[in-house]
Amino acid sequence: MLFRSLANGDIREAVLTPADFGLDAVPLAALVGGDAAENASIARAVLAGEPGARRTAVLMNAGASLCVTGLASTPREAAQKAGELIDSGAALAKLDEWVAFSQGLRGAP
């Protein structure tokens, strides 16, 4: 994963691997999705705690976000925090909130 961050006017760039997050490498073929319905199902499964390659990808991406925002000091710590949010049910609950909100917008003028 290519990772860029901005600090004190300097852009830093690094290539991070699953190992940087304390995770095992996964084959790219295991990350293939499908149509919108299948991808929604995959996202729900990952946020419900399903293990596997897709969870690894989510932990890396969420972890990178936690590092950029300063909510984690290292990629490993960030992936651990992201995993805790998934395993606690908080991530899926937030998705459900977003879904309910967006569906409420359908009827808005």
Task: Name each model feature, range by range.
Residues M1-P109:
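Glycine-rich anion-binding loops and their surrounding alpha/beta cores
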